[in-house]
């Protein structure tokens, strides 16, 4: 499922990122890669996620390109 539809406060695992290489590299620098785990803290116009003890805000366009499953 796209990250923007992931349930709040559940551990999720990234399985696919549908973005260009520049965006994938940016996400990698933030700690979001295939097989990485994250937790959605809130969602709406932007999605707030917790990745390795760091909170990140992702706009809904980017969050729709990150696919996750429950970890």
Functional labels for PLM-detected ranges:
Residues 1-71:
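Compact, glycine-rich, soluble single-domain proteins
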